[in-house]
Structure formats: C-alpha cells, structure tokens
C-alpha cells in the first residue's frame, strides 16, 4: 500500500450503501474499478491483514487514493461499473478488447442490387444482413451466394463501365445485368430469393424454386427448368450441411474455459435455429482473478458495448453459473430496454450446442498454453487477425526472381503448422514472356500450380503473393477461374513492401476485397508472414541464380527452339565451331544434315537477332 494512502481514515468516511469505487495510483491513473452492494464492507476487505490473493496484494500496494460513487441499487452499480471500465480500461480489471466493428453482407438499393462485404457505418442504402462474427464468415457466405444466386458482387463503378460480360458471367456466378443478359424481372426474383436465404428461410426459397421449375417444365421451357433444378439441388446440399436446432429462435451459446490465467469464451451465434457463426474471445485477465469476476466482466462488457453494432438475442446460454447472474440479467435488460435472460441448466439442442461451445473453449485454451510463442501460436494469431472461421493448415507463398528479365524463376514455398514444409517446395522456370514482366511471370506460375487442381488436392488455406495490388489481382483472377468447380478456394493476401523496404512496414492486401492493412512490427503473426515471404524470396533467388549460371554455361545453340544435342553437334562439326555457325548464311546452314530450310532460318534469326 502506498504510504500516502491512509486506509483507516478513508474507511471511516465510506457509506454502507451500494455504489462504485475507483482506485488510483500515484500518477492519477485508474487501476481498478469495482462495485458493491455494501461499499464499506467491500472496501474494508482490501485492507485486512494476511491478504491471501496475489492480485489483491499487488493492487493494494499501488493505491494512492480511492473515489466512491453511490447508486440507488446494485443493478445501477453494475451498469456504472461497466461504464467506468470502458472509460478507463484499468490494468487490474478483466478487459474485453473487442472494439472492432462487426461485418455485414450488404444487399444494395439499386436497379440491379449487388451483394457486398460491409464493415463500418451503414451509410449506403440497402439491406444489411448480420452482423457476422468475423470477416471469414462473411467471405464464406458471399462465396456460397455466388454459387446459389447469380447476383452481381462488383462495385457500382465497375458495373457502369462494362460493355460486355465479365469473367463472373462466364463462370455462371453473375447473370450480367450490366449488359442486359438478364431481364429486370428475373434478376429481381433472384434478389428476393437471396434475401430470403440470408434471413434463414431456405425452405421457403426451395419451395418457390420448385414451383418455378414445375411451371417452366409445363411450359416446355426445359433449359430454364434445368437451371431451377440445379439451383434447388445446390440449396438442398447447403441445407443438409447446416446444423439445425428444433428451436427456431435466436440465442447466443457461450462455452467458457479458464486456466493458468487464460480465459476463452467461445460463442455460437444461433439465429433462426442455425449456427450463424462462431467466435472465440480472449479477455485480458489479471493474475489470480477469480472465475466469477471473469464471467461477470465478460457478460457486461460484451453485451453492453454500445460502440459495436451487434444483434443481441433475448436468450443467452452459458456453461457456468455464478453468484451475480440474476443481477446481471436485470442490469442488461434495463440497459438494453428489452428482455434478456441467462440460462445455465439446459437440455436437448441447447445442451448439445453448449457442449460444442465448451469443447471449443477448452481446446482453445489448451492450444494457447501449449504452443505459446511458437509457430503454432503465430498461426492462431494470424487466424484471429484475418478473422478466419476455420484453422489454417497449409499456407503457400509465391515470389519471382530474375536479373534484368534474364532466367526468370518463380518459387512456391509451403508452410504447415510446424513451419516450413520443404518437401512441398516447387520452382517454375518462366518461359515465353516479355523479359522482366513480373505480372506475366506470376500469371504463368499460379496457372501452372493450380492448372489441374481437384477437390482432394493440396489446396492452401492462405496464398501469399510477394508483391502489390497488380500481381495480387492477376493471382486472384486465376484462382477464381481454377476453383470455380470446387467448394474451397484459398484466401489470397498480397505482401507489399513498406517504405525503404524495411521489415515491419509491410502492407497486407486481401485479394477478394482489396482491403489493405498493416500489423505492428512486433506482431508474431507478422513475423510468420515475414518468415514465409523471406523463405519464398530465398528459394526463388537460389533457383534463379542456378538457372542463370546454367544458361551462361550452355551453348547458345541449345537455347534455340528445336535445337537439341544431336543438331548442335552436327552444326558444330559440319561448320567448324560456334563462331562459324553464327556467321553462316541460311544457304550454308541448310547443307548441314538434319537442318531444314525453316530450321535454318530460325537459327539464322536467333543468332543475329
């Protein structure tokens, strides 16, 4: 305890009413915020002799002074405590750092509406579906929507500039309303069905399509009927894969695991009886904090964070009971002005969802504890930053290396959750492009890598491109083409060099949205990205140098198409050497056995070009 703080003198002035207290250190910073039904009793407990809690001992040793605010009830104290915690972010409180806005799917208000990823203020007119738990869930949903409903996902500027259908039309992902390939009525019908699907009413969508298919068949419009049939089959396949509850309401299911100072709250967002998405939260927990405080702090901060747009259901199911559960229910209900209930003892579907959430929370904590500061942990952090809904198992990175366009080589290196997987590394000798054209080189390498990709093949979860937006766009276009028949496609990320090419200043660009962002220079996730990028660069340079040296040590003749070892030997023997071959005319070259007039012309042009 600070020598300037007189606890006994302070406690004599404290009321036994309900209220909130704020503890300050010598610098005037709030280091802890708490609430109490009886302030005098609660604050006296901090200054007992023989404190056995390490956290409390550390806290008390830094107290310089304490401010107290009285409230009408314990419920009011809970709400005020939460406000102060958000305001001051005290070091000894449990803190949920969840200040990111949540992503939505936007169905725009337009003559031909588009589906788009949206995060931030909802300024654009249209319908917003969500919020989704993370960006990965939105990207997966948009990828699925492209397969189910041929609605455009391009921005309005791109839409206005079209004079002919783009690649998405060729891939049957868009009906090309920009150039009149679909009637307004048919397009509007698909928009309505997509809207119903996003609201969770997939059975209604299927019923509508079945009726349309039967009507088209009766009118002998068999191609149209076949399109409806394929759409119905795709929708039914999706519906079968979704885990559905008999309870059609909305609820959040929270599984909690807390061990060795690491707490994980794994949330399943159940909407219309389906798992809408899931997300793990890791609040900052001071050492020796008890479970009840961790639970109470999370519930308050998660559901009363007014800065984040979030759909809050009336029902929350959580894996642990705690002392102030009913007070929390009342406080959140008052703050939200709606009914809010927290349940712990549940059966049937709720119990099944709860077991799943607890399993995920437990596994998350075990993983964090056992792989801290390892490659595995860096993968976990990268998944969180990229907001992926599934773990990363395989990452690949491409780079191009050449000297003034000579001997271009592309590298592809592979990382798994143990680090570099060198047995999977590949190099591609780049041929037939304008020397120094990195875009064409990247296009050739990516095309060769995924030319015959199949569902059971080695598909990376993340594909890094060492370069800027131009190279990333080329790679994204190829991936879109090659993966159109598959349910899975890699997430592309461009790694653009920072100012002065200094490590730690890289800009990362998402291939599907072209959103750019940066990570802190000391971020373990950035270190993982730098590792795979540097390894790709090293592997490309090594391959380029080997190829360049081999080329320079090889006869010029062997670089001419159609000239192999036999013809090379014949030319040198017949004409007397390389310089004589270079000086020979077409007529002289034709006299060499095995050399046609066309080949002679090719040799002549190549050696004198």
Curated annotation (Swiss-Prot):
Pfam families: GIY-YIG (PF01541), HHH_5 (PF14520), UVR (PF02151), UvrC_RNaseH (PF22920), UvrC_RNaseH_dom (PF08459). The keyword Nucleotide-binding does not apply. Residues 16-94 form the GIY-YIG domain. Keywords: Cytoplasm, DNA damage, DNA excision, DNA repair, Excision nuclease, SOS response. Its main location: cytoplasm. InterPro entries: GIY-YIG_endonuc, GIY-YIG_endonuc_sf, GIY-YIG_UvrC_Cho, Hlx-hairpin-Hlx_DNA-bd_motif, RuvA_2-like, UVR_dom, UVR_dom_sf, UvrABC_protein_C. It is found in: Cytoplasm. GO terms for molecular function: DNA binding; excinuclease ABC activity. GO terms for cellular component: cytoplasm; excinuclease repair complex. SMART domains: GIYc, HhH1. PANTHER family: UVRABC SYSTEM PROTEIN C, UVRC/OXIDOREDUCTASE. NCBIfam families: PRK00558.1-5, uvrC. This is UvrABC system protein C. It comes from Shewanella putrefaciens (strain CN-32 / ATCC BAA-453). The lineage of its organism: Bacteria, Pseudomonadati, Pseudomonadota, Gammaproteobacteria, Alteromonadales.
